């Protein structure tokens, strides 16, 4: 289901047989209609960013619900797909903060230790938040709790009110939190623009003796 170390750690924060419930949910959801991302990519965020390499978390809400957008990592879309509004604003803030990045696929961030996690890992086509409140939040809350237990520092980037509620799970004083309004067009001008999350993250990592993220890669 997921990277094995992730799997063992996450399981300790969930009720017994919860993974079985997730599999049953996925069987029913994918059998009953079009769901994003493709099933093999539901746990991609955990597969491409191993726990031992994770040093940044960017928490999204749920996958993009349009055709060919969702990849299994938050905010990212395939290179040939136009950037959705939130990603446009993320790249605009990145350009103002560090420099321009022309591509929309954020997989290179994931390979550097940036866990691009959505709180809800699936969505019905065309129905934003259509799977919210059903199965995923205990699982992804467990991911945050696992990261909170890490001995090495993690920078948690929390955009928007929904993500900021997850601060309750981040109690380890070794970690850092960067929070701001969400990059969506509805809230980006309320404090997301100008928040400089990318340079601030690297400053925090480098202060801890860790290698910063090449956000432009």
From Swiss-Prot:
GO cellular component annotations of the record: cytoplasm
Residues the record marks as active site: 62 (proton acceptor)
Stored PROSITE patterns: U_DNA_GLYCOSYLASE (PS00130)
EC number of the protein: 3.2.2.27
Location(s), subcellular: Cytoplasm
Disulfide-linked positions: none
GO biological process per UniProt: base-excision repair, AP site formation via deaminated base removal
Gene Ontology molecular function terms on file: uracil DNA N-glycosylase activity
Enzyme class (EC, first level): hydrolase
Reactions listed under catalytic activity: Hydrolyzes single-stranded DNA or mismatched double-stranded DNA and polynucleotides, releasing free uracil
Keyword Transport among UniProt keywords: no
UniProt keyword list: Cytoplasm, DNA damage, DNA repair, Hydrolase
Protein name, entry field: Uracil-DNA glycosylase
Organism: Streptococcus pyogenes serotype M6 (strain ATCC BAA-946 / MGAS10394)
